């Protein structure tokens, strides 16, 4: 049984943890999890406990975690990422440190955990507070998942003294099946799959995953990928995040990556219907004031057909419960704004 080491006595996280432990020990072969809903409506699915245990062993073995190491639970337990932190603790004998899920997971922690799994937003926020940044630097094994790690965040982590990893996975793979190092001499833009995982590209150029330890089915993802001769891969974007504007295909993630260094506020690229172009590239941004030179700034870094035809200031960029940009909500919001 997990024995939580809890720095702050918040009953809601305790109740959620106990509910999951009760479900885990109820004698049934599966537990329920919820997908993030980043590309559409969140879905509920049942996953096998034995495969969650297999996933936990893959991660703990890869990272070299030891029995008795502390593991920080700082993500909601309705999603696979939070559940897998608990399962790793159960399977590997880790000491679970529980905090209320928030944008500042280290705010109430006195001592850095040995192992922590966070989303990019939590890492970014922690870097902004000196005390939290120092604790983050002391985490011996930090994995970051649930969203892309942009170049600026990767640069901020590059000189960390301990291992920092970006993970690749999804609910269907029970958290991650591949990692890439973000700091030190091993830093790379290529993900390395676990030894038991096989990957290839579909005819669409999307990543196909064969990971029998965590899913009995071969999974074809919507992630457009590139493979190298070492069996590694990198993600170029999602097939459903491609905008076809006047016959030119624009990958949303690539456009956002070029804009990120020059836009110091939250933003998202999407598309709205256009009579002439089919789809028009559209930018939503959450700045405190209007940005009259925004289009020119975009033109300075984007090819002509990638540049937004519309820019709309919004109160906030819609996100899912796990902190990802909610692409479906962003697109719907842009369509409403375009209609006036």
Mark where each language-model region is.
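Conserved pre-ATP/AMP-binding loop-to-beta segment of ANL
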Residues: 15-34, 67-70
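Conserved AMP-binding A3 loop
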Residues: 30-57, 64-66
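Active-site glycine-centered loops adjacent to acidic/histidine catalytic or metal-binding residues
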Residues: 38, 119, 146, 169, ...
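AMP-binding/adenylate-forming
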Residues: 47-54, 70-125
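Gly/Ser/Thr-rich phosphate-binding loop
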Residues: 129-184
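AMP-binding/adenylate-forming core of the ANL superfamily
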Residues: 198-220, 224-226, 232, 286
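AMP-binding/adenylate-forming catalytic core of the ANL superfamily
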Residues: 224-306
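Conserved C-terminal "lid"/linker of ANL adenylate-forming enzymes
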Residues: 282-284, 297-340
């Amino acid at each position: 049984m997990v024995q939580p080491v809890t720095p702050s006595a918040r009953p809601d996280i305790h109740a959620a943890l106990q509910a999951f432990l009760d479900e885990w020990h109820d004698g049934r072969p599966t537990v329920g999890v919820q997908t993030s809903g980043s590309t559409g409506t969140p879905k509920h699915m049942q996953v096998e406990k034995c495969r969650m245990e297999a996933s936990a062993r893959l991660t703990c073995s890869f990272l070299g975690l030891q029995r008795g190491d502390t593991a920080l639970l700082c993500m909601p337990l309705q999603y696979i990422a939070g559940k897998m932190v608990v399962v790793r603790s159960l399977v590997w004998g880790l000491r679970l440190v529980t905090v209320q899920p928030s944008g500042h997971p280290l705010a109430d922690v006195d001592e850095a955990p040995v192992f922590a799994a966070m989303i990019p937003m939590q890492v970014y926020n922690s870097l902004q507070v000196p005390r939290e940044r120092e604790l983050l630097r002391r985490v011996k094994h930090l994995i970051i998942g649930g969203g892309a790690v942009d170049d600026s965040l990767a640069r901020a982590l590059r000189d960390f003294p301990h291992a920092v990893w970006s993970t690749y996975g999804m609910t269907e793979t029970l958290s991650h099946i591949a990692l890439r190092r973000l700091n030190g001499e091993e830093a790379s833009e290529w993900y390395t799959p676990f030894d038991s995982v096989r990957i290839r590209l579909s005819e669409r150029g999307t990543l196909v995953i064969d990971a029998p330890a965590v899913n009995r089915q071969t999974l074809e993802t919507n992630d457009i990928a590139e493979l190298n001769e070492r069996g590694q891969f990198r993600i170029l974007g999602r097939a459903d995040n491609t905008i076809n504007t006047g016959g030119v295909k624009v990958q949303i993630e690539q456009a956002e990556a070029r804009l990120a260094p020059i836009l110091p506020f939250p933003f998202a690229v999407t598309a709205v219907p256009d009579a002439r172009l089919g789809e028009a590239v559209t930018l939503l941004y959450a700045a405190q004031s209007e940005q009259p030179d925004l289009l020119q700034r975009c033109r300075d870094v984007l090819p002509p057909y990638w540049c937004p035809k519309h820019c709309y200031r919004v109160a906030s960029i819609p996100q899912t419960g796990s902190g990802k940009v909610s692409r479906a909500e962003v697109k719907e919001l842009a369509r409403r704004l375009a209609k006036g």
